Amino acid sequence: MRTSQYLLSTLKETPADAVVISHQLLLRAGMIRRLASGLYTWLPMGLRVLRKVETIVREEMNAAGALEVLMPAVQPAELWQESGRWEQYGPELLRLKDRHEREFCVGPTHEEVITDLARNELNSYKQLPINFYQIQTKFRDEIRPRFGLMRGREFIMKDAYSFHLSQDSLQQTYDGMYQAYSKIFSRLGLDFRPVQADNGSIGGSGSHEFHVLANSGEDDIVFSDSSDYAANIEKAEAVPRESARGSATEDMRLVDTPNTKTITALVDGFQLPIEKTIKTLVVHGAEEGTLVALIVRGDHELNEIKAANQPLVASPLVFASEAEIRAAIGAGPGSLGPVNLPIACIVDRSVALMSDFAAGANIEDKHYFGVNWERDLPLPEVADLRNVVEGDPSPDGKGTLVIKRGIEVGHIFQLGTKYSEAMKLNVLSEQGKPVNLIMGCYGIGVSRVVAAAIEQNHDERGILWPSALAPFQIALVPLKYETESVKQATDKLYAELTAAGFEVLLDDRDKKTSPGVKFADMELIGIPHRIVISDRGLNEGVLEYKGRRDSESQNLPIGELMSFITEKLSR
């Protein structure tokens, strides 16, 4: 491809509304353009990258035995009403009516549509298991679209849905999708981690997320420094660093603690180690009208998802108001603790191993110091309630935990029978009895992968594409292309490289565009290999080569260039 026949829309300045680096570079490299909030047009350069992601995804899904379909983006409300999600989904679901006043939505996901397809097309156990996938545009009406492709309103996803008679069958397909996803992200050249995850609003049981590691990531992911253990921060199991509770060395005593409403005030005001303090948080109980106290160590944070999963606790999690707390306990936040607590209580594992600790006395402006379990009060229910912190033991007993930022680009779920029961999807078993099908769901944010790749691979000059994603493999930059010798040599090399199957962008812009601008554009776009053809080099029988990740260029004999490039691109 020649730049004279191509849309090369690079920008020198960074648009003011672009915050994250992927958004900045996608705009500056001429890959996307904003149409409206959260809506983007893919320009030719960016579309080449997007299509490469789609190709790899499609190849691995086909290899895993999934069948490609294409479902409508606009979906009838009746299907969402059947599943119960029409009322549940919230304002992110863009709803509309046609001229006949029939209600529809623009699909943020396709569980209802695929379940409807399956109940119309599947009628026998002999057709199972089966796995359908599509690569389709989705729409979620985000309240604040931001970060370009990272959190837009319209985006492209690969979503797959599998159907099974048994949990064992689902597990086999789930494991196959896990392997397929690992192959996809490996082929894309990304540094990623598959992590145990919570199912969220989709529902179901088992779940893994696939995260691209990047400092700009929105999610904290946790993994062992000595094993394959990995989970997101919501799911990661918090193992206490202590193996046993220490012995009591203090008597419990009541202490006046005026104006001490925070852990920081308690620690600073009374010279206490923060590890000897606790936080008591009060939430609504699962039984209507009840409250439950959740207690974590002063230097730890409550994990709200773990808390909401406790049988005694209402889900979704609702924190009690100060008025509710005072009515039930007789004291307000900042003075709460487990001693003589009149409501149900759950303590974190680390709290259960504490000794000689300080706790609110459930009396305004008073704390107990020197509190010890069993001696001063019985140990209540114990559960994993907190977020892990870096350096915690790995739950598998191998190494310690490291926390890094990640960008979620894939998610696989074991949905169970949530949708098949709601929408009456069943087939006849081998015994002739109707059986609700068990489902799996597997998504990849195809357009988000493009942004995530940039977040992980860039420098001060522009994008550093993994080789599988670069829009072109080679940039040919002739100096003084209007010179006959340079033009002939460039055209000959261009023909040889394209005939060999390489993707080449020939920068044949005229002399009004300086060599420096051409070099800067090719680096901004992120083309991995640059070859410069000049009169001086031709006279010396060499061409200048520079890899996008190289600090220095090198001169290569003209006759060796093809073998050199072939070897480089075959790695």
Swiss-Prot record:
Catalytic activity: tRNA(Pro) + L-proline + ATP = L-prolyl-tRNA(Pro) + AMP + diphosphate
Chief location bin: cytoplasm
Intracellular or extracellular location(s): Cytoplasm
Matching InterPro entries: aa-tRNA-synt_IIb (IPR002314), aa-tRNA-synth_II (IPR006195), aa-tRNA-synth_II/BPL/LPL (IPR045864), Anticodon-bd (IPR004154), Anticodon-bd_dom_sf (IPR036621), Pro-tRNA-ligase_IIa (IPR002316), Pro-tRNA-synth_IIa_bac-type (IPR004500), Pro-tRNA-Synthase_IIa_type1 (IPR023717)
GO terms assigned for molecular function: aminoacyl-tRNA deacylase activity; ATP binding; proline-tRNA ligase activity
Pfam families listed in its UniProt record: HGTP_anticodon (PF03129), tRNA-synt_2b (PF00587), tRNA_edit (PF04073)
One GO BP: prolyl-tRNA aminoacylation
Job description of the protein: Catalyzes the attachment of proline to tRNA(Pro) in a two-step reaction: proline is first activated by ATP to form Pro-AMP and then transferred to the acceptor end of tRNA(Pro). As ProRS can inadvertently accommodate and process non-cognate amino acids such as alanine and cysteine, to avoid such errors it has two additional distinct editing activities against alanine. One activity is designated as 'pretransfer' editing and involves the tRNA(Pro)-independent hydrolysis of activated Ala-AMP.
Domain writeup: Consists of three domains: the N-terminal catalytic domain, the editing domain and the C-terminal anticodon-binding domain.
NCBIfam families: PRK09194.1, proS_fam_II
UniProt subunit comment: Homodimer.
Protein name (database record): Proline--tRNA ligase
Organism: Pseudomonas aeruginosa (strain UCBPP-PA14)
